[in-house]
């Protein structure tokens, strides 16, 4: 099945999308990657969805990527004697380490590490920023606050401390258990929540032991500040605008999103724009105009993927949400302004032979009538470099490794094909021509670009580029390679 757009769609699975028929319908409607949220559902439920996805993959004969999203060290308050209290503006309130139900004056905060680093005048946000308190003073077991924005606070509501770098790992004990479980299942991408620094990524990578690719979620101010080192340590990025929009001024999010998308593209690492993209479609079959513009903006900026969360996991119209996102993407990518924007933000980075070859492939495609760029890739690096160029013609990523094919499903434009092992460039060209015909990227009278590395099956050796006819009778006519 050939997609009619290049940006990828990530769909979160949940109660509304737990059956074979629904998940297959999501794929057929446009979902390229399925997200399993480790914050919700048991290991048995996660495994069931994973099994269904792999069965669909087998049935349709197309690689599908699976992204497991770890919960991360989410901060929460304790419980209250009566389930909730109302905080009044300018009133005093206390967070402490006393493990007993709270009242109108105090509540348990079961995160001792915060008491060591939070300072007077820092903010504490409750329930996704609906309630805001300012710290007046701190002792080793109490944080005294004044209420700046009041409201009702109930049991175990989420807590954010935007001005504080918490001296804790990004992986809770639950996360470590979930990480091992997900890696043993065979997931393709592992998303780390509440990353603050590069060493958080390195810790997860050490535990993953090469079994999956690491994707860092940018949702804290400290992660934005340390983004370059986090990006270098990661295989991909998710701009998780929910918590990021709570901890930072909402007006700061759009320029941050634009900068982060551009930075990821420059280093050829995939970036997902996520959170509330079509949020109204949880309850409505139609999105708001503002939501359509939000999705469009991410696509115009050059994001590799856009993501659905509650819309596909728990909404009433999961399939419609995917179809809507697919239709938006097709419309935007057919807009002449889209191509102008994509071309104007292209990276000029050309440091290696592989960089030069992928740039040349894109330039040849722009000046000739070739119909596709076919890249043989073992590790996925060549395909990611071609994807970075955002060529005007389709990208066919050919690899003998199902693991590589699945992982590349997140990259802009990559149509992933499993091919047999090849040991001669002529065989590679023939394989590329057959794939181009099979998936309707080219007819027999057209030409394609083929890139590869010799010796074959050795990562990082991209060193050949050739324009080839699709007609096998004409391939290397008279060439005895």
Where are each of the predicted segments found?
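Non-catalytic helical/linker scaffolds that mediate oligomerization, partner binding
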Residues: 1-481
């Amino acid at each position: 099945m050939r997609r009619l757009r290049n940006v990828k769609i990530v769909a979160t699975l949940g109660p509304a999308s737990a059956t074979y028929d629904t998940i297959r319908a999501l794929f057929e409607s446009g979902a390229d990657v399925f997200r399993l949220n480790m914050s919700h559902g048991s290991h048995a439920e996660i495994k069931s969805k994973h099994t269904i996805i792999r069965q669909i993959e087998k049935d349709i004969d197309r690689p599908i990527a699976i992204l497991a999203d770890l919960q991360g060290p989410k901060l929460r308050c304790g419980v209250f004697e009566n389930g909730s209290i109302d905080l009044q503006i300018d009133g005093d309130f206390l967070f402490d380490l006393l493990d007993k139900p709270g009242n109108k004056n105090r509540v348990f905060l079961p995160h001792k590490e915060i008491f060591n680093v939070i300072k007077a005048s820092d903010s504490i946000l409750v329930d996704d920023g609906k309630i805001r308190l300012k710290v007046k003073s701190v002792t080793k077991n109490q944080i005294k606050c004044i209420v700046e924005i009041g409201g009702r606070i109930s049991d175990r509501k989420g807590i954010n401390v935007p001005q504080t770098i918490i001296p804790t790992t990004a992986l809770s004990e639950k996360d470590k258990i979930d990480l091992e479980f997900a890696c043993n299942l065979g997931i393709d991408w592992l998303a780390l929540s509440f990353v603050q620094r590069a060493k958080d990524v390195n810790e997860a990578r050490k535990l993953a032991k090469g079994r999956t690719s690491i994707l860092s979620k940018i949702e804290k101010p400290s992660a934005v500040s340390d983004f370059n080192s986090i990006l270098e340590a990661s295989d991909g990025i998710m701009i998780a605008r929910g918590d990021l929009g709570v901890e930072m001024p909402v007006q700061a999010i759009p320029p941050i999103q634009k900068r982060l998308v551009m930075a990821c593209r420059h280093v050829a690492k995939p970036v997902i724009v996520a959170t509330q993209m079509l949020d109204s479609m949880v309850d409505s079959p139609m999105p708001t105009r503002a939501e359509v513009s939000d999705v469009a903006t991410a696509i115009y900026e050059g994001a590799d993927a856009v993501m659905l969360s509650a819309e596909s996991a728990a909404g009433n119209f999961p399939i419609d949400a995917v179809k809507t996102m697919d239709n938006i993407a097709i419309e935007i990518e057919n807009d002449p302004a889209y191509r102008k924007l994509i071309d104007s933000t292209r990276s000029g980075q050309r440091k290696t032979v592989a960089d030069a070859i992928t740039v040349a492939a894109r330039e040849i495609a722009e000046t000739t009538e070739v119909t596709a760029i076919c890249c043989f890739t073992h590790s996925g690096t060549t395909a990611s470099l071609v994807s970075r160029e955002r060529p005007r013609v389709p990208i066919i990523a050919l690899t003998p490794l199902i693991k590589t094919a699945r992982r590349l499903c997140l990259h802009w434009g990559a149509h992933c094909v499993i091919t047999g092992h090849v040991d001669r460039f002529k065989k590679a060209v023939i394989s590329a021509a057959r794939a181009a015909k099979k998936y309707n990227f080219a007819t027999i009278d057209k030409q394609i670009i083929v890139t590869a590395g010799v010796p074959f099956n050795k990562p990082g050796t991209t060193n050949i580029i050739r324009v080839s006819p699709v007609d096998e009778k004409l391939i290397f006519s008279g060439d005895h390679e």
